[in-house]
């Protein structure tokens, strides 16, 4: 499904490639990111460059994403995380008020902790000045070490087997 196509609300599974580019800058392509809509859940796989913008272009507010899955930690799969995470908290991004679920291979905790440290002052100022709810920046982390296995640790009624 391309970004310009309307969604079929009767579909059980909709996959949208938000970015298929590489680390090399290309004005026509964003970096790696895939949106999966399944069983009324919005699942995001990787956060390449431009992911938040592509979500908005696809008609999805970043705050609508229920869970984020990192496949691995190459820059073209992660560089858009800060923009997506903090942008989903802002009113223009949907105003996230609940924690974001994030899963990934070993190392996901360090990735998230680094972002929390890097943006601590920004978060503090937005809470104080814009009265944004701090809960919208919270992240629930699940790490795994099994190669080729995808799962959603927060919703037991949705299994995501790798194929």
What do the predicted segments below correspond to?
Residues 1-163:
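Binuclear metal-dependent hydrolase catalytic cores
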């Amino acid at each position: 499904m391309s970004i310009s196509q309307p969604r079929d609300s009767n579909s059980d599974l909709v996959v949208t490639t938000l970015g298929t580019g590489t680390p090399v800058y290309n004005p026509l392509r964003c970096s790696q990111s895939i949106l999966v809509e399944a069983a009324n859940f919005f699942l995001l796989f990787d956060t390449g460059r431009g992911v938040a913008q592509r979500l908005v272009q696809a008609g999805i507010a970043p705050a609508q994403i229920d869970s984020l899955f990192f496949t691995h930690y190459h820059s073209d799969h992660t560089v858009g995380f800060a923009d997506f995470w903090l942008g989903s908290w802002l009113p223009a991004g949907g105003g996230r008020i609940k924690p974001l679920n994030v899963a990934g291979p070993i190392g996901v905790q360090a990735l998230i902790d680094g972002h929390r440290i890097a943006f601590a002052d920004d978060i503090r100022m937005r809470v104080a000045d814009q009265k944004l709810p701090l809960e919208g920046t919270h992240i629930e982390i699940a790490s795994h070490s099994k190669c080729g296995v995808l799962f959603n640790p927060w919703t037991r009624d949705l299994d995501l087997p790798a194929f």
